[in-house]
């Protein structure tokens, strides 16, 4: 049976005198200078720490941490007035019929490196009705769903489920009312029925719908690129409070190779549906960027 060298406690990871426990070949097989560099990098970038603990100290990790800080994601810039956009690349999250659903449209202007995001959210009307019947002043999930509905940022669907057809209707609204045509729409193939997919294809064309497989192979690099664009304030989402809530709720899970994917926190009330919809759209945008930009 192979013997695994590891630290006695994860707290020893930044104590050079303890490193020999997990690295008996330190100084020969692995240079101390290399380990010092990796530890310092982890101190400067906490998201890198789980990688160091696993690869250099053999400490098992479930590497999960916040994807964006509030400083990263906060952007109060508003969208330009109507008529600024002609095409968009869409994405939507429809994973749960009895909960929050979201759709996004990435728009862009010629000569402008910012991405402008249009969005819509849906929730079952029963969620709000139950709250009113209970006289509960604290809204479910601790956020003001009723206010967001009254502000037009979110829509309700009658009953206890979201009829996912409303997502198609919203993209049709963009086309018919705002003259913004969806060039492509990204979707998770696990969470769309054949019937709804056929309806999208009938409305916009078979080639418009693009599968976005979930997991690190598809999402890792786009997540890293999108994070950088948020940090550079190149993602303009009209200061939408639901977007901010979903973004701040999003955590990233990192494997030992540094690949990342989005995950929900352990708290059920912390929704990330808006982030999931944006990522689906952004993955397609990255793959279709040249074609998209040639049309704007």
Regions found by a protein language model. Name each.
Residues 97-111, 274-281:
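Acidic, metal-ligating active-site segments
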Residues 289-296:
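Phosphate-handling catalytic cores of nucleic-acid transaction enzymes
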Residues 1-21, 203-289:
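Metal-dependent DNA phosphodiester-chemistry modules and their immediately adjacent helices/loops
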Residues 4, 89-93, 102-105, 184-186, ...:
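Structured core elements
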Residues 179-190:
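Short glycine-rich phosphate-binding loop at a beta-alpha junction
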Residues 1-89, 100, 116-159, 166-169:
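Non-catalytic, compositionally simple segments
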Residues 54, 101, 165-172, 194, ...:
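Feature representing long, continuous alpha-helical segments
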Residues 192-208:
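Conserved helicase motor "Helicase C" RecA-like lobe of SF1/SF2 P-loop NTPases
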């Amino acid at each position: 049976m192979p013997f695994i060298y590891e630290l006695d406690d994860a707290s020893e990871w930044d104590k050079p005198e303890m490193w020999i426990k997990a690295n008996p070949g330190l100084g020969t097989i692995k240079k101390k200078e290399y380990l010092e560099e990796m530890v310092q990098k982890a101190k400067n970038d906490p998201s890198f720490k789980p990688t160091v603990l696993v690869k250099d100290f053999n400490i098992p990790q479930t590497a999960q941490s916040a994807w964006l800080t509030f400083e990263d994601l906060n952007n109060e810039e508003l969208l330009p007035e109507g008529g600024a956009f002609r095409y968009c690349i869409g994405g939507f999250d429809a994973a749960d019929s009895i909960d929050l659903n979201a759709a996004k449209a990435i728009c862009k202007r010629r000569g402008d490196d910012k991405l402008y995001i249009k969005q819509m959210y849906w929730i079952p009307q029963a969620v709000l009705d139950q709250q009113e019947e209970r006289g509960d002043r604290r809204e479910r999930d601790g956020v003001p769903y009723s206010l967001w509905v009254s502000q037009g940022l979110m829509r309700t669907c009658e009953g206890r489920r979201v009829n996912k057809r409303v997502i198609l209707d919203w993209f049709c609204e963009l086309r018919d009312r705002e003259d913004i045509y969806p060039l492509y729409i990204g979707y998770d193939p696990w969470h769309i029925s054949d019937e709804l997919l056929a309806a999208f294809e009938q409305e916009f064309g078979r080639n418009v719908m693009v599968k976005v497989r979930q997991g690190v192979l598809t999402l890792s690099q786009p997540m890293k690129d999108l994070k950088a664009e948020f940090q550079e304030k190149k993602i303009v989402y009209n200061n939408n409070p639901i977007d901010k809530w979903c973004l701040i709720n999003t955590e990233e899970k990192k494997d030992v190779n540094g690949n990342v994917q989005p995950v929900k926190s352990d708290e059920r009330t912390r929704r990330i549906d808006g982030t999931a919809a944006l990522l689906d759209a952004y993955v397609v945008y990255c793959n279709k960027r040249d074609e998209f930009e040639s049309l704007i």
